[in-house]
Amino acid sequence: LVKHIKSLSDENFNTDDYTCFLGRGAYDHYIPSAIDQLILRQEFYTSYTPYQPEISQGTLQAIFEYQTMISELTGLPVANASMYDGASALAEAAVMSCEATRRNEILIANSVHPESRQVLNTYAKFRNIIVKEIQYNNGQTDLDDLNAKINDNTAAVMVQSPNYFGIIEDVEAISEIVHKNK
């Protein structure tokens, strides 16, 4: 029975034999073997966020050491490693872009994960930031729509690659459009 089921399953394409671009966050992930040992350290068994400093000293120490190392590697005076996840990091980057450029419009590809776009809209709602979505064509960011929407008030153009549909975006073409319209 096991051999029969295995022979049936072998008729399917699988991610062991083919490159996977399923999208929606379903990708092959490489996890270095050192991680298995590091997660066993006691300081990582504390809470997810260091809101209770008295029981999160290990997490705070690890964040401090990481930030210090990144600062030394990059030569920058400061580094920050306290973003929750990709969606909040995207939203924080949008806010920083608006503050740095003194512009208040963000263009985000409609092919970015919907939950990330929702988080961005939540951040933007009370900050006078206008979020406009760039449509997609055949699963990729529509470059004509980007060209039509980018303007002097655009603080940032945000894309995800591979995108929500698992398609690699033409980041080089997007970058050319953005730099042409600085």
Labelled PLM ranges:
Residues 59-63, 70, 176:
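Noncatalytic linker/hinge segments flanking ATPase motor cores
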